[in-house]
Curated annotation (Swiss-Prot):
Changing K879G: Abolishes enzyme activity. It catalyses: L-tyrosyl-[protein] + ATP = O-phospho-L-tyrosyl-[protein] + ADP + H(+). GO terms for biological process: blood vessel morphogenesis; cell migration; cell surface receptor protein tyrosine kinase signaling pathway; cellular response to vascular endothelial growth factor stimulus; lung alveolus development; lymph vessel development; lymphangiogenesis; negative regulation of apoptotic process. The active site is at D1037. Residues 797-1363 are cytoplasmic. SMART domains: IG, IGc2, TyrKc. This is Vascular endothelial growth factor receptor 3. Changing R1041P: In LMPHM1; loss of kinase activity.
Length: 1363
């Protein structure tokens, strides 16, 4: 195929070269052995003509239209063409042989170069005209129709076989003789006749005489035609597509002058093979003639594809029209993007096209969709046209194409991004035009656009006029807004001297469902009028808001003042001042409302409008104060020298807006109180007072005007002094510690302008002053002593209740603390927040999609610009509150921030990166982002990709070993290598996070999941929990859902308390009003509400079960109810997953020890798992893979895989395990037999072995359960508060054993349900062991100090087979 294509290419180049030579006339023509132009032979003779040339040759003669393509072809009708011997100058030679020629062989014999298209006489061809004389048939033409038009002359083709004859032309009415002018004879072409001579002829014949005999040629029927062709059309106009086997029909139509004649000819690929036929048609119209030729080919094939040319000729004009015919073997649909998958437009565009490159046959059905919804209307499959593009036009547009008959379907999607010019929303609402002097003002611009503008620029200029110009309105089409054209704008800075700037902040805020850019300029002190503008722009436009910041000394620019301002009394002078700023208002007027106009005829109050206040009020004469030079306000004063009751009423000041000419008014009501004489409401009475007692006398008065009150004693003016007080406008007289000289006559005198009134009384004093002084001393001393003791008791109580500062700070390091002991708010008071280190600018944080919602918070993916040194943009997770969060929720998130700061950074903990705490926006806590989500979902998704024997790359193994080595180095040198470990892996992780997808070293979704990965995840979780334990932090909810997976196989412990909706999480069970993860909780946490690091170790064992079951839900098929809690406390445990090796099973069982003290510490777990990850067990992995153990049966398909971790890994690890784990080691093969810690008795630890019974042997009460193991819900698992109270009550009342002495070992059993559902007590030693319960963590009872025991515990496994 390739060789043939190369050969064709060379041939094409050669032909092109030859064509070029021909066009330049530089080619040597072929030569004939007959040199004369005409050669004459007789009928029956043989003809032999040889031709030589420089290139391959071919012959053409009257007996054949074309020479054979290759080789020789013998035929008596067509003659014989043979090769002959050439010469050096002309190596190619062809000879043409004709035997027994006859008259019809008369004609032109042409020799030409075979591979050159152009036949040019004397250049690429040579010819000779041969006459074959037949004296019995001198004329050789056939009957034909001769089309005669209005041209000057035309040929009558009377061809002869004998040259030199005398020929005349005869019609039905005349004979024409050649005269060399109007009638000319040519032996080769016939008779050339002037057209006007033929208009009356019906037919024409040529006549000659040879010897004594006359000969006539075949007649030519004369048809007089028009000679103008108007147009030609080939239908279908466009290229025609067909399938193999279909019919091709082409219609070539010519519009010509009336009664015109046209000769049609077709050129197409199948013409030589005589495929198809064309049929002429003629339709005469009133003004013209339509002539058609219809080409039809049945059952088209691949050979019929190509160019089809229709040629029309009337002898004067030649028309040509062509089309392409494409033949397909099978139906097909091909669609591609024409301009790429993402197209951009601008809001407001009148027309936008979404084009695609479509090739299909037959034409398919199609439908356009936008964001999954079908679009109505008529559309084209080649382009979707959108009119009046808006922001709502943004979306994904999908073109669906289908051919139901052929079963073909194709889809293509295009993303349209509509860019929106920025708009400032404050322009839509009216803003104040006047601002009070010395006030604090905030100017705000809220902008929205696509793309979102990231910044808003502020400018200012002095208060001077600006020119106005017209600009197209962005909000009202076909309208224009008048915009001021101002110059001399300056950038606003915080050091602006005109009006002091307090702050200038810009941030992104989620408003009305959109992210908008908000900028606030706070002016600390408005002193000077100025013009401000905010400018916002993006790549498709710009918008600006002009703010006229006019500063005035008059509040709101218009006010009324009254002097005096308090209640008016009859006779006082009153001054009403109406002040208005001259910049905004003019035409000040005073009115007094008529009382009759305030109510209608029915007494209902009228609503008065400032626009027509003059209709309801009486104008008043007032004086306009003179305005000082430079002042911008006017004051219209209304003065009343002596106010009287008739002046009481409503006074209105009316002003007019300078620009809008609207009327504005303020109303002031004057209330006038008439004067009246004072009167006493209570007279003074005589009093008898003891020495040192208190004395109080009241002179209560009434009157319209506050009168003056004066006190006299024994007709002398009484004034205030030490021990004598006058209060309540002198109406009350008080004397403290009365003495003998205070006795006498007291007079109260009350006066005003209308008159005076008096009242008097006598005061008598009895007793001795010495006795009174002693009583005072005793009372004061008693009070001082009582206060002293009260303060002392208060200090003692506070010291007992509040621990020392250091104790509180140390204890708070445990994040999960009982709030009943120390409230969370009080704990956080001792943790600081360093804004200089952790505060991150809001404008460099771009919020993205929501990762999770909670009851009152959410976690959002975001892009932080410059949060790490040396990086431009990092993906982070942002914890924030929902809208409408309460103050307590805000304090809770702030507490979490302080706790994260205090804990510090660690590789295997989700670390704090920064925070946004400033009041300009919501509180946001920025933490690391883990791209692979939580470990539980990741393991489930990777089950199909689990390949236990897959080889890890040297880089991955090196990374695993580095984790272990650095962890051990950290343990030997605390506080040093931890930072090295975090820095090393966080740098790798951060580099992967910031690298492009093409540069990312590894994608965990593409790589297989191996046993090494599971051990590595377990090791890292233990490492992170070891760090939290060292910081005295108790997690309390350690589970695979709270473990996140990041780049480079790094896992991180998290607890997104705000993001997790525990009320919907099926892993949680409600306890009263709270929800508890009972499947992960240790028995002491369930029954005693005790949370310690050892209870986290229990949860770590459940987490191991999740990891090695590839994300399954713990306790599959088990109903979480009261019986579950009892069985868990009694020693029943889960059965290990089949992927767990003996070493992993042993770790699980030790983590599930009923005695918290017997559980391993996280430091021990780090050492053991580190040995498994790095030790010799993994080095022998290849040997293990060749001898896999048989898998356990499980309903879950992914659990039936063959475990490839070696059994001897566990045995090898057991040799290096700490003693605390070795003495509970599990036999390699019999993983249903365990040695489990029992109870402690007086510090002595006794352990024994007993056979473990699986859950299949002793199942729980049957329950109906539906659902998968992975998504096991806790429907019906909610334990009400009453149920927990019953459990706790039993756990206090039931004394499961009675230990009477150190030497006695008493068996204690608990009832188990029998086959009928009744509870029975197991016999001693049943099923291979006795049941004992630990007094502190097992039975949940309260034994006396004498109680002690030393039993062995029997432990039952929950197995997934029970499901």
């Amino acid at each position: 195929m390739q060789r043939g294509a190369a050969l064709c290419l060379r041939l094409w180049l050669c032909l092109g070269l030859l064509d070029g030579l021909v066009s330049g006339y530089s080619m040597t023509p072929p030569t004939l052995n007959i040199t004369e132009e005409s050669h004459v032979i007789d009928t029956g003779d043989s003809l032999s003509i040889s031709c030589r040339g420089q290139h391959p040759l071919e012959w053409a003669w009257p007996g054949a239209q074309e020479a054979p393509a290759t080789g020789d072809k013998d035929s008596e009708d067509t003659g014989v063409v043979r090769d002959c011997e050439g010469t050096d100058a002309r190596p190619y030679c062809k000879v043409l042989l004709l035997h027994e020629v006859h008259a019809n062989d008369t004609g032109s014999y042409v020799c030409y170069y075979k591979y050159i298209k152009a036949r040019i006489e004397g250049t690429t061809a040579a010819s000779s005209y041969v006459f074959v004389r037949d004296f019995e048939q001198p004329f050789i033409n056939k009957p034909d129709t001769l089309l005669v038009n209005r041209k000057d002359a035309m040929w009558v083709p009377c061809l002869v076989s004998i040259p030199g004859l005398n020929v005349t032309l005869r019609s039905q009415s005349s004979v024409l003789w050649p005269d060399g002018q109007e009638v000319v004879w040519d032996d080769r072409r016939g008779m050339l006749v002037s057209t006007p001579l033929l208009h009356d002829a019906l037919y024409l014949q040529c006549e000659t005489t040879w010897g004594d005999q006359d000969f006539l040629s075949n007649p030519f029927l004369v048809h007089i035609t028009g000679n103008e062709l108007y147009d030609i059309q080939l239908l279908p106009r466009k290229s025609l597509e067909l399938l193999v086997g279909e019919k091709l029909v082409l219609n070539c139509t010519v519009w010509a002058e009336f009664n015109s004649g046209v000769t049609f000819d077709w050129d197409y690929p199948g013409k030589q093979a005589e495929r198809g036929k064309w049929v002429p048609e003629r339709r005469s119209q009133q003004t013209h003639t339509e002539l058609s030729s219809i080409l039809t080919i049945h059952n088209v094939s691949q050979h019929d594809l190509g160019s089809y040319v229709c040629k029309a000729n009337n002898g004067i004009q030649r028309f040509r029209e062509s089309t392409e015919v494409i033949v397909h073997e099978n139906p097909f649909i091909s669609v591609e993007w024409l301009k790429g998958p993402i197209l951009e437009a601008t809001a407001g565009d009148e027309l936008v096209k979404l084009p695609v490159k479509l090739a299909a046959y037959p034409p398919p059905e199609f439908q356009w969709y936008k964001d999954g919804k079908a679009l109505s209307g008529r559309h084209s499959p080649h382009a979707l046209v959108l009119k009046e593009v808006t922001e709502a036009s943004t979306g994904t547009y999908t073109l669906a194409l289908w051919n139901s008959a052929a079963g073909l379907r194709r889809n293509i999607s295009l993303e349209l991004v509509v860019n929106v010019p920025p708009q400032i929303h404050e322009k839509e609402a009216s803003s104040p035009s006047i601002y009070s002097r010395h006030s604090r003002q905030a100017l705000t611009c809220t902008a929205y656009g696509v793309p979102l503008p990231l910044s808003i620029q502020w400018h200012w200029r002095p208060w001077t006029p600006c020119k106005m110009f017209a600009q197209r309105s962005l909000r009202r089409r076909q309208q224009q807004d008048l915009m001021p054209q101002c110059r001399d704008w300056r950038a606003v800075t915080t050091q602006d001297a005109v009006n002091p700037i307090e702050s200038l902040d810009t941030w992104t805020e989620f408003v009305e469902g959109k992210n908008k850019t908000v900028s606030k300029l706070v002016i600390q002190n408005a002193n000077v009028s100025a013009m401000y503008k905010c400018v916002v722009s993006n790549k498709v436009g710009q918008d600006e808001r002009l703010i006229y910041f006019y500063v005035t000394t008059i509040p709101d620019g218009f006010t009324i003042e009254s002097k005096p301002s308090e209640e008016l009394l009859e006779g006082q002078p009153v001054l009403l001042s109406c002040q208005a700023d001259s910049y905004k208002y003019e035409h000040l007027r005073w009115y007094r409302l008529n009382l009759s106009t305030l109510h209608d005829a029915h007494g209902n109050p009228l609503l008065l409008d400032c626009k027509n206040v003059h209709l309801f009020a009486t104008p008043l004469a007032a004086s306009l104060e003179e305005v000082a030079p430079g002042a911008r306000h006017a004051t219209l004063s209304l003065s009343i020298p002596r106010v009287a009751p008739e002046h009481e009423g409503h006074y209105v000041c009316e002003v007019q807006d300078r620009r809008s000419h609207d009327k504005h008014c303020h109303k002031k009501y004057l209330s006038v109180q008439a004067l009246e004489a004072p009167r006493l409401t209570q007279n003074l009475t005589d009093l008898l007072v003891n020495v040192s007692d208190s004395l109080e006398m009241q002179c209560l008065v009434a009157g319209a005007h506050a009168p003056s009150i004066v006190w006299y004693k024994d007709e002398r003016l009484l004034e205030e002094k030490s021990g004598v007080d006058l209060a309540d406008s002198n109406q009350k007289l008080s004397i403290q510690r009365v003495r003998e000289e205070d006795a006498g006559r007291y007079l109260c005198s009350v006066c005003n302008a209308k008159g005076c009134v008096n009242s008097s009384a006598s005061v008598a004093v009895e007793g001795s002053e010495d006795k009174g002084s002693m009583e005072i001393v005793i009372l004061v001393g008693t009070g001082v002593i009582a206060v002293f003791f009260w303060v002392l008791l208060l200090l003692i109580f506070c010291n007992m209740r509040r621990p020392a500062h250091a104790d509180i700070k140390t204890g708070y390091l445990s994040i999960i603390m009982d709030p009943g002991e120390v409230p969370l708010e009080e704990q956080c008071e001792y943790l600081s927040y360093d804004a200089s280190q952790w505060e991150f600018p809001r404008e460099r944080l771009h919020l993205g999609r929501v990762l999770g919602y909670g009851a009152f918070g959410k976690v959002v993916e975001a892009s932080a610009f410059g949060i790490h040194k040396g990086s431009s943009c990092d993906t982070v997770a942002v914890k924030m509150l929902k809208e409408g969060a309460t103050a307590s929720e805000h304090r809770a998130l702030m507490s979490e921030l302080k706790i994260l700061i205090h804990i510090g950074n660690h590789l295997n903990v989700v670390n704090l990166l920064g925070a946004c705490t400033k009041p300009q926006g919501p509180l946001m806590v920025i933490v690391e982002f883990c791209k692979y989500g939580n470990l539980s979902n990741f393991l489930r998704a990777k089950r199909d990709a689990f390949s236990p024997c897959a080889e890890k790359s040297p880089e991955q193994r090196g990374r695993f070993r580095a984790m272990v080595e650095l962890a051990r180095l950290d343990r030997r040198r605390p506080g040093s290598s931890d930072r090295v470990l975090f820095a090393r892996f966080s740098k790798t992780e951060g580099g992967a996070r910031r690298a492009s997808p093409d540069q990312e070293a590894e994608d965990l979704w593409l790589s297989p999941l191996t046993m090494e990965d599971l051990v590595c995840y377990s090791f890292q979780v233990a490492r992170g929990m070891e760090f939290l334990a060292s910081r005295k932090c108790i997690h309390r909810d350690l589970a695979a859902r709270n473990i996140l997976l990041s780049e480079s196989d790094v896992v991180k412990i998290c607890d997104f308390g705000l993001a997790r909706d525990i009320y919907k999480d099926p892993d949680y069970v409600r306890k009263g009003s709270a929800r508890l993860p009972l499947k992960w909780m240790a028995p002491e946490s369930i029954f005693d509400k005790v949370y310690t690091t050892q209870s986290d170790v229990w949860s770590f064992g459940v987490l191991l079960w999740e990891i090695f079951s590839l994300g399954a839900s713990p306790y599959p098929g088990v109903q979480i109810n009261e019986e579950f809690c009892q069985r868990l406390r009694d020693g029943t445990r889960m059965r290990a997953p089949e992927l767990a090796t003996p070493a992993i099973r042993r770790i699980m069982l030790n983590c599930w020890s009923g005695d918290p003290k017997a559980r391993p510490a996280f430091s021990e777990l780090v050492e053991i798992l580190g040995d498994l990850l790095q030790g010799r067990g993994l080095q022998e992995e290849e040997e293990v893979c060749m001898a896999p153990r048989s898998s356990q049966s499980s309903e879950e398909g992914s659990f039936s895989q063959v475990s490839t971790m070696a059994l001897h890994i566990a045995q090898a690890d057991a040799e290096d395990s700490p003693p605390s784990l070795q003495r509970h080691s599990l036999a390699a093969r019999y993983y249903n037999w365990v040695s489990f810690p029992g109870c402690l008795a007086r510090g002595a630890e006794t352990r024994g072995s007993s056979r473990m019974k699986t859950f299949e042997e002793f199942p729980m009460t049957p329950t109906t359960y539906k659902g998968s193991v992975d998504n096991q819900t806790d429907s019906g698992m909610v334990l009400a508060s009453e149920e927990f109270e019953q459990i706790e009550s039993r756990h206090r009342q039931e004394s499961g054993f009675s230990c009477k002495g150190p030497g006695q070992n008493v068996a204690v059993t608990r009832a188990h349900p029998d086959s009928q559902g009744r509870r029975r007590r197991p016999e001693r030693g049943a099923r291979g062991g006795q049941v004992f319960y630990n007094s502190e963590y097992g039975e949940l009872s309260e034994p006396s100090e004498e109680d002690h025991c030393s039993p062995s515990a029997r432990v039952t496994f929950f197995t997934d087979n029970s499901y």
